[in-house]
Structures are given as C-alpha cells and as structure tokens.
Amino acid sequence: DFKHLYEYYPPVAPTKVGTYSRGYYSNDNFFSFVSDINKDGWPDVLTVGLPNTPAYWYENPGKSFNGPGPEQPEHWTRHFVINAVKNEAPTFGDITGDGEPELLMAYDEHYGYVSPNPVAPTLPWIFHPISTHENVIHHYTHGLGFGDIDGDGRHDYIIGDGWTQQPASLQFGEDWQYHQYPFVNRAGDNAYASLNGGGDMYAYDVNGDGLNDIITSLDAHGWGLSWYEQVRKDDEITFKEHIIMSKQAENTDNPYGVQFSQLHAVDLVDIDGDGLKDIVTGKTYRAHDFADEGAREDPVIYYFRLTQKSDGSAEYVPHKVDDDAGIGRQLVSGDLNADGLPDIVAANKNGTFVFTQRRRSVDQDEWKKAQPMRLKGF
C-alpha cells in the first residue's frame, strides 16, 4: 500500500543546470540499484548522481521495515564507490558472469565497469577499463547496455557507436575487441550531436532466429525507437534496422499511429506472460524543462508487446499504460505485490508512480475493442 516512508539519507538540494527556467536536477540520485553488496543478507542501495558526479552505496542496517518510519530517521551508512560516473544510462548487471552485478559506466577516457572488493566492499570500488583507445568521453553521452551478441556465452558491451566483444580472459587492462556500428545517429552540426543516443540498450533475440538483436531508443531528447536485427554472413556480424517509432515528429513508421519523444529509459520485461520480453518505455516528463522536441505532448507510458510471426519476422504492438505520469531517467518493472504479474515503477519531476498490473476476464467483443487498431496504408 506504500503508506510507510523510510528515509535512508538526508535530503540534498537539487542542482540547476543550463538556462532552462526549471532546469533543476537531482544531484545525488539519477539512478538507484538494489543489491546485497556486503553479503549480510540485507539489500543495500547503490546510487548514481548527475553525470560526472560520484556514486555511493548505502548500507542497510538490517532492521524490520514492517511499520511506519521513525520520526527521526536513522540514516544508513554511506560508502564511497567512485568519484565520477560518465554516461546518462549507467546500468547495473553481471557483465562478467561471476554471479555478481557490476556498475557499467564510462570513466575518464574509457568505457568499463566498477565492482566492489569482495573482501572489503566498503572500500572504494575498482574500475576495470575494457579499452584503452578512446578519446575523452563526454559525461553526457547517451546509451549503454550489455548482452551476448556473438553467441559465445559471454556478455558484450553495447554503446551507441557499436559493441565491444568480451574476451575469454578478463585480465585487468586487456582491450576488448571493438566493432563499430551506428546504432544511433551522432552526425550533424548540432554541438551535442556526438552525445546522441537513448537510454538502456539491450541484446535480445527479437525474431526468434537464435541470434541476439539490439534494442534501443535513438534520442533521449528527441525521437525514435528501433530494433536492429543481427545478420550473419560467414564470420561477419552486421545489423538491419527495424523502426518501431519514427525518427522525427511525424509518424511514418508505426502502423498503430503511436509516436512520442524523449525515451530516456527503456525496460525489457515479459509483461503478458507469453515468454517473450516486451519493451516498456515512455516520454520523459520535462527532461530539459520544455526545451526538447515534443516536450508539451502527453507524458505517456507504453509497453510494446513483442509478437513473433511464422515467417521469421517480428512486430511490436503498442499498449498504453498511462498518459499523465511520464518517465524519468530510470524505469523499472517487477512484481511489487507478489501476484505473479510484473508492475511498473516510474519517477521524475512529476512525482513517483507505481502501475500495478491487473487482469480480468472479458468477452470476445470487449477484448477486440481493447486491441490497438492498425492504420490504413501500413
């Protein structure tokens, strides 16, 4: 019922960025991830702040949380992780395959990941660069993810410009092999064009051919959502783009007429229980106040239901979840009420929102009326 509030660290004043009339941002908490970092049986909280600011983790004191929070909060002990996290879509997952999650990010001139010392997790975390050849990476660069692209059983590193292949050995300082591919458009005269990209990026077998494809939004402050079909020719890996939502304000690609901007966060989860992972995303609420394209349109949340067809093709069918909340820099799906159905959590400048999934029995006519309608000409 979400009636009880627990404050695990004191409020921090927001940071004003740029010249926007309300361009304020959470300096200390752009992203939050939950994991038992010190292995004491209690989940802790890892926070990542505004790009190029530190990350910390907060140690769960291991007390009961069944009643209302205390009037005088007992704040959790804060532990330093790293002094600066670059990229606007850092992610927390087990890229190394050791059973423990790492924080994927950029630092200085390198993409890589940080992980705690397993013997002393309260010490600063260790940064593991996956390459030594980049120029300085701008902290506002968008788009990052991981997954097994080449099918060798090891997770690879995905960015807007391509993917980096994990080697068989994770010897410290060893370069991962980089494969360039323009998943997002970073060309143009705009001063920020080189930073373009979406949010979370995924490797997932969309069309069921046994090869993992790439799923990404294309511009976190503009338009576009695509999946890139992996194509093999001999030993070469390349991709074929399939547009889910158009790359400009006018819809020219979505057969159901769905078009919205500012997809700054994307989640991948099986919403309907058919065994296929669907896309959950939405329009960011006032990402740059009202300066972004489409900023004054409804702050919607959608899930795109994946359907695989007998001819080997695939389609994402859009279903609206909400048209008033919007999303923020992070979007999380999970079963909050233990009913076996995934729910959705979103937080932004508009508030914090929980969307609990509910199912009911209907007749055939009502079911048909609820289905998205294809536009003529598609």
Q: Language-model features: where?
A:
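Beta-propeller-forming repeat regions
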Residues: 1-378
